[in-house]
């Protein structure tokens, strides 16, 4: 059995995660910082860790999320708001 390959992980869930991170973030020097455990995101969206991690990776690939400090259970992210960059 061949598993289907998900080529586009920037779906509604990824954008919802991005919006959630922006809501939780603290404004800092023209951007936003958020320190959040992955388990908080998993609980919020009621999805498994693998699904959430794939969407976070897609957000990183799109340049909307930049990990600054990564620890075992949480990560400090620089969250970019595309509305502010284009406005």
Describe the function of each predicted region.
Residues 10, 70-87:
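Short, cationic-aromatic polyanion-contact patches
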Residues 7-35:
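Short helix->loop/beta-hairpin flanking segments within DNA-binding domains
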């Amino acid at each position: 059995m061949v598993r289907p390959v998900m080529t586009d992980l920037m779906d509604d869930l990824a954008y919802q995660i991005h919006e959630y991170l922006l809501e939780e973030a603290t404004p800092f020097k023209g951007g936003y910082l958020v320190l959040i455990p992955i388990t908080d995101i998993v609980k919020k969206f009621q999805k498994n860790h693998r699904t959430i991690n794939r969407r976070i990776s897609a957000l990183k690939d799109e340049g909307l999320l930049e990990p600054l400090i990564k620890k075992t259970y949480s990560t400090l992210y620089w969250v970019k708001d595309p509305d502010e960059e284009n406005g």
